[in-house]
Amino acid sequence: MKYIFLDTNIVIDFLADRKPFSLAAAKLFNFSILGKAKIYISAVSYNNIYYILKQSHSSVEAIKLLDELSEMTEITDVTKSIIKKSLKSDFKDFEDAIQYNCALTLTKIDFIVTRDTKDFKKSTLSIMTPEEAVSLLENSSR
């Protein structure tokens, strides 16, 4: 089993069915359903995901999708310590700094999946695009 931290953009791709990105994102969630991956997302992602989903879904539909998401993933806490580290980090994007510092708190994490790999250049964790992660998971399943 692989332990994967998903950046917010990947979750939005999946839930909002943003083509062409949703295909790889859906495959990642399928690996989770099959027990081949455990997916982590940060708690702070929920408000960002809700905001984006509300642009194309009713509030009730967006809440339903977030509830389903909570059943498919592990949610990492965003603590004061994570915020402080993120504020002092070398990351250019504050939200990415929060995501990264949340991932660092996990005892088991194989990689972070994001479409914004350039924003994670300072990462000490492995960073993959959704397509790279899908390829790795497909090859490790054989």
Residues covered by each model-derived region:
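A short, flexible beta-alpha/helix-coil linker loop
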Residues: V11-I12, Y46, I83, D119
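Short, well-structured N-terminal submotif of metal-dependent ribonuclease cores
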Residues: M1-I41, K54-E61, K122, E132-R142
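Short loop/helix-cap segments at secondary-structure boundaries that form the rim of catalytic
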Residues: K118-L125
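Active-site-proximal, substrate-binding regions of enzyme catalytic domains
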Residues: A26, V44-I82
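Hydrophobic helix-cap positions at the C-terminus of alpha-helices
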Residues: F31-S32, L69, L106
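Active-site neighborhoods of divalent-metal-dependent phosphate/nucleic-acid chemistry enzymes
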Residues: E74-T117
